[in-house]
Amino acid sequence: MKTFIPFCMILMAFGWQPTAQAAGTPEYMAVLAVMGYGYTVKVSINGADAGVKGGKSENRRLFNQDHEMAKQALPAIRAQNFVLKPGENRIAVEYTKTDPKSSDTLEVKLELEGYPEPVFLLQSKAKSSGKIEKQFVLQKPAPKDFKSIVVNE
């Protein structure tokens, strides 16, 4: 550690700036998993469309907004995948069954690295359409009293 501080000072003299993670901001990585057979689905995280369409199984890897990889990502990827932030976040899910008589089950799950259970879990079989909006808090480490947001429709 004694060598790291002077080395950082030398790098900063040449214009290097520490990343958000190096400066102490936690790094968040999550997986958004959607089993949307028989449904059209739209998922937004903090107002950003995650690019989920439904009709199949889809997964998205999500990161915090100031993740160091965000700088290298194409703007469209950055807008869909680098959407998480420390503290309060919002997830919105809109869905419609493509065939109201279908017995397909929709499942939308947001799993955060280091958390014991999904942060958010939606399961719907009975409703032909719906819109759910929930808020969740991200912090590292996961709170001891963490409870998953579970919606069954």
Task: Name each model feature, range by range.
Residues G15-W16, F63-N64, D104:
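Alpha-helix boundary/interfacial micro-motifs
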Residues M1-F4:
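Positively charged n-region of N-terminal signal peptides that target proteins for export
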Residues F63-I77:
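Aromatic sugar-binding surface patches on proteins
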Residues P18-E58, L74-E153:
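Beta-strand-rich recognition domains
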Residues P6-G15:
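Bacterial N-terminal signal peptides
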